[in-house]
Amino acid sequence: MEIAVEREEENYLELRIQGEDHTLGNLIAGRLRSVKGVILATYYLPHPLKDELVIKIKTDGTISPREALNRAIEDVKVLGESFLDELEQV
């Protein structure tokens, strides 16, 4: 996985991630939408034959896009740990 900042402003962040597809894009964008202060969280694949995605994050100014991304990633980590804990109970 290789991550590059395509565009960054005070309330906007656009990342290009090499080697990933809808799986990561949907997971991160979905979690970002639940972070308070995020007004846009989306992703797209620039080309269907390349493993590459672009994530766009826009906030209302109460939180930075990078902080929102960090919170979303933490949520994903907690979700994964919870899933593993539940799986061990089965």
Swiss-Prot record:
GO terms for biological process: DNA-templated transcription. Its main location: cytoplasm. It holds the Pfam family RNA_pol_L_2. The keyword Nucleotidyltransferase applies. The keyword Transmembrane helix does not apply. GO terms for molecular function: DNA binding; DNA-directed RNA polymerase activity; protein dimerization activity. Keywords: Cytoplasm, DNA-directed RNA polymerase, Nucleotidyltransferase, Transcription, Transferase. PROSITE patterns: RNA_POL_L_13KD. It catalyses: RNA(n) + a ribonucleoside 5'-triphosphate = RNA(n+1) + diphosphate. GO terms for cellular component: cytoplasm; DNA-directed RNA polymerase complex. Disulfide bonds: none annotated. It is found in: Cytoplasm. Its EC number is 2.7.7.6. InterPro entries: RBP11-like, RBP11-like_dimer, RNA_pol_Rpb11_13-16kDa_CS, Rpo11-like. Part of the RNA polymerase complex. DNA-dependent RNA polymerase (RNAP) catalyzes the transcription of DNA into RNA using the four ribonucleoside triphosphates as substrates. Belongs to the archaeal Rpo11/eukaryotic RPB11/RPC19 RNA polymerase subunit family. This is DNA-directed RNA polymerase subunit Rpo11. It comes from Metallosphaera sedula (strain ATCC 51363 / DSM 5348 / JCM 9185 / NBRC 15509 / TH2).
